[in-house]
C-alpha cells in the first residue's frame, strides 16, 4: 500500500467518496482507495468488536457474594450448596486469571466439584446458572452413556466435543468452560472384585475420565470418534475446564451409617440411626464414596463435595413462583399471548408440589404436572373467543377436573366443571 502523489487526478476514497484533496491521506489497494478518515473509523469499529469479544469471557470476576446473588434469582433453597459452589467457582476462575509468571512459585491446582442430591433437587440448574453467570461455554453430559474406548457407547472425548460446540469451536473459550456430568453415581464400580468381568461402563469410565478431570491435552474428533475415524482431530487443553459432577448416590446414607456405626460401638445400637438422611449426607467422607464404588484416584480429582437437600412442599411452591423464570410465570406469559389471564390457587400450587414429591421427581417433575393440567386448555383457548381467565384449582390437579374458565365480565363459563 502507498500514498498517492497530489498530481494524480480524480482519485477518490472508495468508502466515503471524498476526493484526495479533501482528505489528508489516500491509500490504495488493488483497485480501491481509502482515506485516513475512513481508516480511523474502521479502526474504532475493530477496537469495539475486539473489546466486545473480550467481554464475552469475564473481564471482572464476580465475587462469591455476587455469584450467590445471581444463583438466588434462579435457584430456590439449597443455601449451603450455593455457597460452596460460589466459593469454588470464584477460586477456580481467580486461579485462571492468576496464571502466568509467579514470583513465589506457588501453583494453584484445579478443584472440580461433586453435587450430591436426589433427582429434581437442582443440580443441573445450579451448574447451568453458574455458566450463565460467568458467561462461559457450558455442556451437559450423561455418565450412563459413556463407555471405555472400543466398546459401544460414547467416548469421554465426546464430552469435550459438546463443550467445543457450545463455544462455536472457539477453543480458547472452550478451555475456560464448564462441563456438567450427570448421574456420575451410575459409573460406580459394580463389584469389589474387578477381575470377574470387564466393567466397561463403571470403573473403566472412571479411569477414562481421570486425565481430562485433572488436566491434559485431549484429541477430540469434531464429528464424533467412532463413525468418522479418519477425521482431523481438535486439540484442547482441559487444565482450566471446570468439571461439576452430579449424582443422586441412592443408598450412600447406608454406607455413611455403617461407618458412623463403627465409631459408636458400646453405645445404644440405634445411635447411628438418629441421623436423618440429610444430616447423614453432611457427614460424607471420601471413604464413603470409595465404598460406594468410586475409585480413589477419581475421588482425589473431585475434592469439593456439596450436598443438596430433598425439596419439601414449601420449597417446591417457591420454585413454582419465585425465580425469574418460574414455571407459573412462564405459563402465565404463554396464555397472555392469547389474551388470557392464568391464575393458580394456593391449593393448586400445594397439590402440584405434593404430586411431584409423590412421584419422587422433585422440581424436575413440576413442568409435566402443569402440562397435564393445562394441555386441554392450551388446545381449546386459542380458538375460544369468550375465555378471558383460567383458574387452576386443587381439583384440577388432584381430580383431573377442568380449570375454572371466566369471560370478560368475570362470569364462570364452565359451570359443570365439577362433574367428572
UniProtKB/Swiss-Prot annotation:
- Residues that, per the record, bind Zn(2+): 13, 16, 35, 38
The protein in question is named: ATP-dependent Clp protease ATP-binding subunit ClpX
The record's listing under PANTHER family reads:
ATP-DEPENDENT CLP PROTEASE ATP-BINDING SUBUNIT CLPX-LIKE, MITOCHONDRIAL, ATP-DEPENDENT CLP PROTEASE ATP-BINDING SUBUNIT CLPX-LIKE, MITOCHONDRIAL-RELATED
What organism is this sequence from?
Answer: Staphylococcus epidermidis (strain ATCC 35984 / DSM 28319 / BCRC 17069 / CCUG 31568 / BM 3577 / RP62A)
One of the record's GO cellular component terms: HslUV protease complex
Q: Quaternary state and partners of this protein?
A: Component of the ClpX-ClpP complex. Forms a hexameric ring that, in the presence of ATP, binds to fourteen ClpP subunits assembled into a disk-like structure with a central cavity, resembling the structure of eukaryotic proteasomes.
Provide the family line: Belongs to the ClpX chaperone family.
The ClpX-type ZB domain, residue ranges: 1-54
Give UniProt keywords alphabetically.
ATP-binding, Chaperone, Metal-binding, Nucleotide-binding, Zinc
Task: Return the InterPro entries for the record.
Answer: AAA+_ATPase (IPR003593), ATP-dep_Clp_protease_ClpX (IPR050052), ATPase_AAA_core (IPR003959), Clp_ATPase_C (IPR019489), Clp_protease_ATP-bd_su_ClpX (IPR004487), ClpX_bact (IPR046425), P-loop_NTPase (IPR027417), Znf_CppX_C4 (IPR010603)
User: Where, by residue number, does ATP bind?
Assistant: 118-125
GO MF: ATP binding; ATP hydrolysis activity; ATP-dependent protein folding chaperone; protein dimerization activity; unfolded protein binding; zinc ion binding
Give the HAMAP family listed for this entry: ClpX (MF_00175)
What function is annotated for this protein? Answer: ATP-dependent specificity component of the Clp protease. It directs the protease to specific substrates. Can perform chaperone functions in the absence of ClpP.
Amino acid at each position: 500500500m502507498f500514498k498517492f502523489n497530489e498530481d494524480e487526478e480524480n482519485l477518490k476514497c472508495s468508502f466515503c467518496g471524498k476526493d484526495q484533496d479533501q482528505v489528508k491521506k489516500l491509500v490504495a489497494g488493488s483497485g480501491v482507495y481509502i482515506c485516513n478518515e475512513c481508516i480511523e473509523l474502521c479502526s474504532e469499529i475493530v477496537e469495539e468488536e475486539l473489546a466486545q469479544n473480550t467481554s464475552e469471557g469475564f473481564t471482572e470476576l464476580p465475587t462469591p457474594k455476587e455469584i450467590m446473588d445471581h444463583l438466588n434469582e434462579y435457584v430456590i433453597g439449597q443455601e449451603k450448596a450455593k455457597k460452596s459452589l460460589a466459593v469454588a467457582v470464584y477460586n477456580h476462575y481467580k486461579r485462571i486469571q492468576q496464571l502466568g509468571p509467579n514470583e513465589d512459585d506457588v501453583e494453584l491446582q484445579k478443584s472440580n466439584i461433586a453435587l450430591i442430591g436426589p433427582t429434581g433437587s437442582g443440580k443441573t440448574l445450579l451448574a447451568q446458572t453458574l455458566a450463565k453467570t460467568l458467561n462461559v461455554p457450558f455442556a451437559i453430559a450423561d455418565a450412563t452413556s459413556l463407555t471405555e474406548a472400543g466398546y459401544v457407547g460414547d467416548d469421554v472425548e465426546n464430552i469435550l466435543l459438546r463443550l467445543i460446540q457450545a463455544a462455536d469451536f472457539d477453543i480458547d473459550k472452550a478451555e475456560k468452560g464448564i462441563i456438567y456430568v450427570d448421574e456420575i453415581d451410575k459409573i460406580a464400580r459394580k463389584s469389589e472384585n474387578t477381575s470377574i468381568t470387564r466393567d466397561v461402563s463403571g470403573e473403566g469410565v472412571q479411569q477414562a475420565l481421570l486425565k481430562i478431570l485433572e488436566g491434559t491435552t485431549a484429541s477430540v474428533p469434531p464429528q464424533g470418534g467412532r463413525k468418522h475415524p479418519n477425521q482431523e482431530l481438535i486439540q484442547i487443553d482441559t487444565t482450566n475446564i471446570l468439571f461439576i459432577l452430579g449424582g443422586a448416590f441412592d443408598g450412600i446414607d447406608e454406607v455413611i451409617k455403617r461407618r458412623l456405626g463403627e465409631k459408636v460401638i458400646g453405645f445404644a445400637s440405634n445411635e447411628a440411626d438418629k441421623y436423618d438422611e440429610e444430616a447423614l449426607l453432611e457427614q460424607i467422607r471420601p471413604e464413603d464414596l470409595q465404598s460406594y464404588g468410586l475409585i480413589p484416584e477419581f475421588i482425589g480429582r473431585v475434592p469439593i463435595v456439596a450436598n443438596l437437600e430433598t425439596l419439601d412442599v414449601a420449597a417446591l411452591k417457591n420454585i413454582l413462583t419465585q425465580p425469574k423464570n418460574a414455571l407459573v410465570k412462564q405459563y402465565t406469559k404463554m396464555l397472555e399471548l392469547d389474551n388470557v389471564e392464568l391464575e393458580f390457587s394456593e391449593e393448586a400450587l400445594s397439590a402440584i408440589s405434593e404430586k411431584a414429591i409423590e412421584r419422587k421427581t422433585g422440581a424436575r417433575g413440576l413442568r409435566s404436572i402443569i402440562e397435564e393440567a393445562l394441555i386441554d386448555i392450551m388446545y381449546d383457548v386459542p380458538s375460544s373467543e369468550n375465555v378471558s381467565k383460567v383458574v387452576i384449582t386443587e381439583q384440577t390437579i388432584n381430580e383431573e377436573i377442568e380449570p375454572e374458565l371466566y369471560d370478560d365480565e368475570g362470569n364462570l363459563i364452565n359451570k359443570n366443571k365439577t362433574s367428572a
